[in-house]
Structure formats: C-alpha cells, structure tokens
C-alpha cells in the first residue's frame, strides 16, 4: 500500500526518536542496576521495552506504506546522576510528545487515519505513563530530598 511520502518521512523522524528513547532508557536502566537501585532499574527497563514496541509499530507501518525505515537513532543525552537522568528522560519525553502531536496533525491532513491512530496511542502512553511517572519522581525528590528518595529505590 503506497503511503504519502510526507507521512512516511515523518514516521521515520518519529522512529529515530523512539530508537533514541529506547537507547537512553537502556543505558539509564543499566546504570540504575549497577548502582543498586532495583526499583528504578525495573521501571526504566519496562520503559525501554515500551519504546521498543513503539519503534516496532512505526517500523511496521513504514514498511506497510512501502517506505524505507531509517534505523539510525537520534543522539541521546544520558545523565550522570539520578536527578540528571530523570530530567534528561523527561526532556526526551516532552520532545516526543510534541513530535507525536505534529505527526497526528500531518496524518489527518493526508487522511492516513491508521497512522494517526498509532500515533495517538503512543501519545497517550507518553503523556499518561512515561512523562507522568518522571514528573512524579522529580516531585518526590523535591519533597523527600535526594537521599531519602534514593533509599526508597533500593
């Protein structure tokens, strides 16, 4: 099924972003594991798996639309401390949210409602799960203090 070139190109833009999010969550999850923060490791490992699923959905859609997937992730910006890592992940999720909203509008413009629905599902996951959880963690650090927060993540 031939897709609109502009939609395919934008789906590729989103794909490279999802691959970057996957990679950033991957490194952060392994850093948390190495530092002994098992709760943070488990959550970020889960997020990495979800980003992989998002990338897979985009990849499959691009192929169905007869496009060529771009499998080179965007640059990642891993943190070196827990607060930096949470902030970096939240910044990434906010970027993804804006990109998904733009993609939804583009898909509607070109009447590609299946791609739009894929992006809408990913947007809901980004807003209601990923970004919300990261905002919660940063709020906990602000209220509890970093030392108490880190102790709660062992």
Curated annotation (Swiss-Prot):
Class of enzymatic activity (EC top level): oxidoreductase
Keyword terms: Cytoplasm, Ion transport, Iron, Iron storage, Iron transport, Metal-binding, Oxidoreductase, Transport
Disruption phenotype: Produces about half the wild-type levels of catalase A in strain PAO1 (katA), slight increase in sensitivity to H(2)O(2), a double katA-ftnA deletion is more sensitive to H(2)O(2). When grown in iron-limiting conditions is less sensitive to H(2)O(2). BFR complexes are composed only of BfrB.
Annotated catalysed reactions: 4 Fe(2+) + O2 + 4 H(+) = 4 Fe(3+) + 2 H2O; Fe(2+)(in) = Fe(2+)(out)
PROSITE patterns named in the record: BACTERIOFERRITIN, FERRITIN_LIKE
GO biological process, one term: iron ion transport
Cellular localization per UniProt: Cytoplasm
Coiled coil: none
Binding site for Fe(3+) B: 51, 93, 130
Site (described: Dual function in ferroxidase center and iron gate): 130
Pfam families found in the cross-reference section: Ferritin
Residues reported to bind Fe(3+) D: 47, 50, 129
Ferritin-like diiron domain segment(s): 1-145
Its EC number(s): 1.16.3.1
Superkingdom per UniProt: Bacteria
Principal localisation: cytoplasm
Induction field: Transcription is up-regulated by FeCl(3) and H(2)O(2).
Residues given in the record as Fe(3+) E binding sites: 50, 129
Family: Belongs to the bacterioferritin family.
Protein name, as recorded: Bacterial ferritin
Gene that this sequence comes from: ftnA
